Amino acid sequence: MYLINQNGWIEVICGSMFSGKSEELIRRVRRTQFAKQHAIVFKPCIDNRYSEEDVVSHNGLKVKAVPVSASKDIFEHITEEMDVIAIDEVQFFDGDIVEVVQVLANRGYRVIVAGLDQDFRGLPFGQVPQLMAIAEHVTKLQAVCSACGSPASRTQRLIDGEPAAFDDPIILVGASESYEPRCRHCHVVPTNKDK
């Protein structure tokens, strides 16, 4: 999968919540470290669910990360000795993230990004669709539907145990208490007038 003759490319890891995106990002970063490559990991400041300075998977795996407020802040932390740039929760970054990732790949870095490809409504989320379009490698992971056990490609937001309405805020950082994986058929997004 990674037989590329020239340095610099983009890998996207996407899927619903609880599909293993952060776990896969951590796995890839650790593999590069075993190969004596230099990697740096970034995360958005907004993601402080488990740790402010680590990327942490839902099952507890973690790797040190640099929290940044804006996409272009990433450039301040890049050195020539770096081989791999990893970015978790990429859907929370501003619109400049696509350009930042392109520039890094064009400079010869292997760039690995992970994030939700759909928001809780089942619509494309943030800049992830654009990143998928320009990536050399896209890995779409699925979870298991918490309602029926089928493969889950969507994220259900729950508020007091009930599905969130379509016009609720898009970004609400949470974990198992407010989100669960759902398949296409069990994913429900009512309008406020339906509630």
Curated annotation (Swiss-Prot):
Keywords of the record: ATP-binding, Cytoplasm, DNA synthesis, Kinase, Metal-binding, Nucleotide-binding, Transferase, Zinc
Biological-process GO terms, alphabetical: DNA biosynthetic process; thymidine metabolic process
Location relative to the cell: Cytoplasm
Active-site residues, record numbering mapped to chain: 89
Annotated positions binding ATP: 15-22, 88-91
Gene Ontology CC entries for this record: cytosol
Main location: cytoplasm
GO-annotated molecular function: ATP binding; thymidine kinase activity; zinc ion binding
Positions of Zn(2+) binding: 145, 148, 183, 186
InterPro entries in UniProt: P-loop_NTPase, Thymidine_kinase, Thymidine_kinase_CS
HAMAP family, A to Z: Thymidine_kinase
Subunit structure: Homotetramer.
Protein's name in the database: Thymidine kinase
Organism listed in the record: Bacillus cereus (strain 03BB102)
Species classification: Bacteria, Bacillati, Bacillota, Bacilli, Bacillales
